[in-house]
């Protein structure tokens, strides 16, 4: 696990956006795993700006979103398909036919989950998976007690997650309690994982994910198993890490190493 601690949410978004942009420059036909919620919005704004400035293209990109509410059509303003269209897809040069969000209105949700897994595999797997983290350590809609090798499936949301997401729904509006989500095993299959977290409300979850035991009680702790997981967090989200100064030291040494390697490559 690479732990990157930055000053604030703006720096976190900038770092994450640059990582994705560099991925697309290396591999223009990358397969991106994308996330919703408040955390990635600033990152998406930076991707839109870079695309509109001609700094990066999404023409060859295929994308798969982590999750979707079960029971909402893609045209519903609170659906994650609507979120992705309005926050990113409609503003960049991506082929919308190559953007995938689990179908919240599927007649047969079980079959839809199996088909989603097959689509990811047919695309060659996910090159970089973007994640947020819930206060209870959930990633996607993999709530505590989720199997660490689980695949895309229907999940019941915890009351804590329902309450966290209630701010996105109008008073009295129907709020789903079920979702379709990539499983933890599906997420771990990605070649690289990028998790962003900001704010003191995420500090306990970050501590459990990074320094706690590998446990289904904190789904994000499964990232300890990943060969290339990068956690980019601000000072507030890092505030409860016992070894945060050590993580800063490791990252500083890593940056020096990368600079040396770049200099050697430039001198070839």
Swiss-Prot record:
Active-site annotation: 67, 136, 138, 143
InterPro entries: Glc/Gal-6P_isomerase, Glucosamine6P_isomerase, Glucosamine6P_isomerase_CS, NagB/RpiA_transferase-like
Keyword Hydrolase: yes
UniProt pathway: Amino-sugar metabolism; N-acetylneuraminate degradation; D-fructose 6-phosphate from N-acetylneuraminate: step 5/5
EC number: 3.5.99.6
Molecular function via GO: glucosamine-6-phosphate deaminase activity; identical protein binding
Residue stretches spanning the membrane: none
A single cellular component GO annotation: cytoplasm
UniProt GO BP: carbohydrate metabolic process; glucosamine catabolic process; N-acetylglucosamine catabolic process; N-acetylneuraminate catabolic process
Pfam families: Glucosamine_iso (PF01182)
Record key words, sorted: Carbohydrate metabolism, Hydrolase
Top-level taxonomic group: Bacteria
Catalytic activity: alpha-D-glucosamine 6-phosphate + H2O = beta-D-fructose 6-phosphate + NH4(+)
Subunit structure: Homohexamer.
NCBIfam families: nagB, PRK00443.1-4
Family designation: Belongs to the glucosamine/galactosamine-6-phosphate isomerase family. NagB subfamily.
Entry function: Catalyzes the reversible isomerization-deamination of glucosamine 6-phosphate (GlcN6P) to form fructose 6-phosphate (Fru6P) and ammonium ion.
Name of the protein this chain belongs to: Glucosamine-6-phosphate deaminase
């Amino acid at each position: 696990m690479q732990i990157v601690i930055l000053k604030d949410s703006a720096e976190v978004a900038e770092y994450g956006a640059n990582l994705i942009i560099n991925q697309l420059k290396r591999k223009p036909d990358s397969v991106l795993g994308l996330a919703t919620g408040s955390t990635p919005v600033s990152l998406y704004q930076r991707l839109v700006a870079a695309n509109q400035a001609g700094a990066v293209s999404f023409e060859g990109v295929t994308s798969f979103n982590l999750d979707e509410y079960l029971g909402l059509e893609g045209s519903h303003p609170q659906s994650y398909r609507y979120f992705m269209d309005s926050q990113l897809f409609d503003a960049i040069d991506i082929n919308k036919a190559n953007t995938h969000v689990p179908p919240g209105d599927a007649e047969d949700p079980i079959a839809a989950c199996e088909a989603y897994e097959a689509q990811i595999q047919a695309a060659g797997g996910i090159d970089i998976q973007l994640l947020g983290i819930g206060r209870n350590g959930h990633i996607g809609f993999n709530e505590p007690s989720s199997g660490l090798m689980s695949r895309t499936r229907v999940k019941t949301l915890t009351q804590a997650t329902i309450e966290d997401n209630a701010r996105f729904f109008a008073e009295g509006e129907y709020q789903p309690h079920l979702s379709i989500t990539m499983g933890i095993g599906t997420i771990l299959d990605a070649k690289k994982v990028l998790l962003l977290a900001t704010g003191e409300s995420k500090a306990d979850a970050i501590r459990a994910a990074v320094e706690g035991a590998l446990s289904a009680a904190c789904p994000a702790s499964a990232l300890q198993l990943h060969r290339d997981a990068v956690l980019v967090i601000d000072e507030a989200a890092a505030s409860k890490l016992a070894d945060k100064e050590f993580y800063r030291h490791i990252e500083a040494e890593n940056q020096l190493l990368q600079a040396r390697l770049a200099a050697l490559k430039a001198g070839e």
